[in-house]
């Protein structure tokens, strides 16, 4: 029995360390993406001001997923006042403590014909950390259509990130729809930016 308990503890430790390593690698890649995109609001000197919650294992959720093929494209407003064309792709349903929750995943209709982004799904959301420990305008998650197979989807809030509007003016960041407002705090993913908010030329 003692050997079984020891092996179980070792296995859990290995899995936990592996998950943390994966998340650290993901966040390093996330930072590098700012440097490879000339439109990005952050430069190398700014990356030190990015801040993240520690990994939260319970923030990795397996949700039920239902496609919404009858939904028509609509104009999603952004914080700059322009709109972006999206379509509801499906609904993820899960529990968080005592709460039963739904989040809508969206397909970007502008990028649909681009082979690099045709499988991309967008999950904007708000929660009770906004304006306290995270950006007031909500956060985003990137998903793939392949993630929605077999009627389930894994949502990892540890990978939640800020819209570029969190760092600078001049960007057209979609406003998370009311359907995606969670009535509790998700203390996982990216926190509020610690650097100075910038002003840049409006994106096109």
Model-derived regions, located:
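Bacterial Sec-dependent N-terminal signal peptides
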Residues: 1-22
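Extracellular/lumen-exposed scaffold segments
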Residues: 21, 44-47, 52, 72-88, ...
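A mature extracytoplasmic/lumenal domain signature
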Residues: 65, 105-107, 127-129, 157-161, ...
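Mid-length scaffold segments of soluble, non-membrane domains
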Residues: 76-137
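Short, surface-exposed linear segments at secondary-structure transitions and domain or protein termini
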Residues: 110-118, 143-152, 194
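Acidic, glycine-rich flexible loop segments
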Residues: 122-163
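Extended, aromatic/histidine-rich regions of cofactor-dependent oxidoreductases associated
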Residues: 161-204
């Amino acid at each position: 029995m003692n050997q079984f308990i020891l092996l179980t503890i070792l296995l859990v430790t290995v899995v936990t360390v592996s998950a943390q390593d994966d998340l650290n690698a993901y966040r390093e890649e996330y930072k590098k993406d700012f440097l490879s995109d000339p439109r990005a609001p952050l430069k190398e000197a700014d990356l030190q001001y990015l801040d993240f919650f520690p990994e939260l294992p319970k923030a990795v959720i397996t949700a039920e997923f239902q496609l919404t093929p009858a939904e028509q494209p609509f104009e999603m407003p952004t914080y700059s006042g322009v709109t972006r064309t999206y379509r509801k792709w499906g609904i993820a349903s899960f529990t968080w403590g005592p709460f039963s929750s739904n989040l809508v995943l969206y397909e970007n209709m502008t990028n649909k014909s681009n082979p690099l982004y045709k499988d991309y799904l967008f999950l904007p959301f708000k929660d009770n950390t906004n304006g306290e420990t995270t950006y007031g305008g909500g956060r985003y998650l990137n998903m793939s259509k392949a993630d929605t197979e077999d009627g389930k989807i894994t949502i990892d809030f540890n990978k939640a990130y800020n819209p570029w509007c969190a760092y600078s003016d001049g960007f057209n960041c979609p406003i998370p729809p009311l359907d995606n407002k969670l009535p509790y705090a998700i203390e996982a993913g990216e926190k509020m930016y610690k650097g100075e908010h910038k002003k840049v030329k409006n994106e096109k």
